[in-house]
Amino acid sequence: MPKMKTKSGAKKRFRVRPGGTVKRGQAFKRHILTKKTTKNKRQLRGSVAVHETNMGHMAQMLPGRGI
């Protein structure tokens, strides 16, 4: 049986943390920022963890990463 391949789009967008959680960037921060408030843009900074309901999809897209 051939090796399972990682989805190339997923490996560019997600990082697996040592504890097994997956880190992702925030959406809605690329363009059309003039109508967004400063508070909203500030809260969209940084990265967050992928929700546990989506971890099954992450395990399929990133095989062999200890998820």
Curated annotation (Swiss-Prot):
The lineage of its organism: Bacteria, Pseudomonadati, Pseudomonadota, Betaproteobacteria, Burkholderiales. The gene is rpmI. One of its GO terms (cellular component) is cytosolic large ribosomal subunit. HAMAP family: Ribosomal_bL35. SUPFAM superfamilies: L35p-like. InterPro entries: Ribosomal_bL35 (IPR001706), Ribosomal_bL35-like (IPR021137), Ribosomal_bL35_CS (IPR018265), Ribosomal_bL35_sf (IPR037229). The keyword ATP-binding does not apply. GO terms for molecular function: structural constituent of ribosome. The keyword Ribonucleoprotein applies. Keywords: Ribonucleoprotein, Ribosomal protein. Residues 1-16 have a biased composition (Basic residues). It holds the Pfam family Ribosomal_L35p. This is Large ribosomal subunit protein bL35. Residues 1-24 are annotated as: Disordered. GO terms for biological process: translation. Belongs to the bacterial ribosomal protein bL35 family. Gene3D superfamilies: 4.10.410.60. It comes from the Bacteria.
